Amino acid sequence: VRSRFIKHFDGSTGNVYASPGRINLIGEHTDYNDGFVFPGAVEQGIIAEIKPNKSRKVCAYSIDMKDYVEFSLDDEQGPSATHFRFVYGVCREMMKLGVPVEGFNTAFAGDVPLGAGMSSSAALESTFAFALNDLFGGNKIDKFTLAKVGQATEHNYIGTNCGIMDQFASVFGKAENLMRLDCRSLQYK
């Protein structure tokens, strides 16, 4: 990611953030019905390099899709390509929480197999939620809320009426651990 970031953004470097994809052993499709699930983080994930650019514009390069876009944080529509709508949606949801998001340059990639049910989208959302919380929010937003930012991004900008399991596993997941999650109360262990 770093070499692509340097190539696209005039040799500068930024901060690197990453979040994992997930597996789920029990309870697939029960999270959006407030049921119990048994997910865990996996080694595969999304990694992004991000650097504020002192503007209101996001300049984003998807390494895997070989695609680049620029969009304004003040644009009510956002980009049309789905992989960039995730980034746009996280920005907008963080701004709704009062995080003073500013423009940034980013390059991102992942090794979560697309379409394999391992939540590459949640890993992308979580990566950017962690990054924006760090860069612009002083890390004041708690992990529960960051997971909900990802879920709201799916609902409001992608059109997917998902539950919370994918984002929760990406935000709270730990290596070599599974978690029992009650999707109604968000209690887990």
Each predicted region: which residue ranges?
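Anion-binding (especially nucleotide phosphate/pyrophosphate-binding) glycine-rich loop
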Residues: 1-16, 44-149
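Short Gly/Ser/Thr- and Asp/Glu-enriched loop/turn motifs at secondary-structure junctions
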Residues: 18-20
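Short Pro/Gly-enriched beta-strand edge/turn motifs at strand-loop
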Residues: 28-33, 152
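Conserved hydrophobic/aromatic beta-strand scaffold that supports enzyme active sites
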Residues: 39, 47-49, 178-180
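ATP-dependent small-molecule kinase catalytic core of the GHMP/sugar-kinase superfamily
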Residues: 138-189
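Short Gly/aromatic-enriched secondary-structure transition segments
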Residues: 34-41
